[in-house]
Amino acid sequence: MEKFRVIGSTQPLQGEVTISGAKNAALPILFASILAEEPVEVANVPHLRDIDTTMELLERLGAKVERNGSVHVDAGPINQYCAPYDLVKTMRASIWALGPLVARFGQGQVSLPGGCAIGARPVDLHIHGLEQLGATITLEDGYVKAHVDGRLQGAHIVMDKVSVGATITIMCAATLAEGTTVLDNAAREPEIVDTAMFLNKLGAKISGAGTDSITIEGVERLGGGKHAVVPDRIETGTFLVAAAVSRGKIVCRNTHAHLLEAVLAKLEEAGAEIECGEDWISLDMTGRELKAVTVRTAPHPGFPTDMQAQFTLLNMMAKGGGVITETIFENRFMHVPELKRMGAKAEIEGNTVICGDVDRLSGAQVMATDLRASASLVIAGCIAKGETIVDRIYHIDRGYERIEDKLSALGANIERFRD
């Protein structure tokens, strides 16, 4: 099993890093390509395990998939309608295959998905949305099966709970429905906006993406087109936090400040100097005092849950007691016991973690438990005294492209090895 060996240093991380395309936009866009009867080209797709799995899944369905810089998908030849367990078990995002399959072909089935073990992420909202569009859904032998005679039908859907995943499922399925769908209490994340932009380039008629009310006028077919995936705001935030806790200075390229305004505001509150350009963000923490901040995760445009673990580490290294409250997912403080193994001070009370400050962490053997938690452990290793071994780094490979190379370019001492 692969691991990271990180040798900590008191030297600040400095330099430039190029941000990859957003996994959380690339995945739904690749699944949405199932809807297209003509070839599509998707640029700025990160090289990640989940992307590779998605491409393999599309090929299993019968699509022609090729990667030479951009990802090219021809979903015209699709003749299979089942996302099998052997692929789906590793990736929760595979549920996004269901809506496009039933919308275009009238049938689809997806094995109940896997992914990060960070609490309840039920597929009920996906299922209920497809049912409201006229699909018949059954659960059999561990598979979610969807069927419709003819086309799905447009509907007015009010989501019981704000859900990024279900918003994407319903929006994609409704593009080929007969009539107009209005989706209220929709999620507003930038990745939803990006998916809608992609679909509109193929001939969909979607308006309101990025607000809590999305309108989709159904069309009979989608054609081909080209699209570049939006930059990864979570990767951007992760590297900015890495620079902040190391008292460094970095520039993130190929990213946009409007994607992570809540994160930038908290970094400034923590004492960082932030500057932004059209496609770059810089952070300077040189000679500045890191101050603890109070964070409460919330749906976009609030503070993203995917940055919670990184800010937990920031608060542990900052002056003053920081409090972080997680409102999106349960069981998302699994990084805290691992950081405490490195000497961090923190107490978990329900959905809140209260951090105390320490002068410096100490290297230790730690275990990654989910994607974002693993990033916080790697950053902790960069600033700790001595050697840190991060185990189960397959989690980090699901969401960060070449993180060890990018950190090394900033001055970190990190290597991947297999024992």
From Swiss-Prot:
Its EC number is 2.5.1.7. Its main location: cytoplasm. GO terms for cellular component: cytoplasm. Transmembrane segments: none annotated. The active site is at residue 116. GO terms for biological process: cell division; cell wall organization; peptidoglycan biosynthetic process; regulation of cell shape; UDP-N-acetylgalactosamine biosynthetic process. Keywords: Cell cycle, Cell division, Cell shape, Cell wall biogenesis/degradation, Cytoplasm, Peptidoglycan synthesis, Pyruvate, Transferase. Gene3D superfamilies: Enolpyruvate transferase domain. One of its GO terms (molecular function) is UDP-N-acetylglucosamine 1-carboxyvinyltransferase activity. The keyword Cell division applies. It is an enzyme of class 2 (transferase). It holds the Pfam family EPSP_synthase. InterPro entries: Enolpyruvate_Tfrase_dom, Enolpyruvate_Tfrase_sf, MurA_subfamily, RNA3'P_cycl/enolpyr_Trfase_a/b, UDP_GlcNAc_COvinyl_MurA. The keyword Cell division applies. Belongs to the EPSP synthase family. MurA subfamily. PANTHER family: UDP-N-ACETYLGLUCOSAMINE 1-CARBOXYVINYLTRANSFERASE. This is UDP-N-acetylglucosamine 1-carboxyvinyltransferase. It comes from Vibrio cholerae serotype O1 (strain ATCC 39315 / El Tor Inaba N16961). The lineage of its organism: Bacteria, Pseudomonadati, Pseudomonadota, Gammaproteobacteria, Vibrionales.
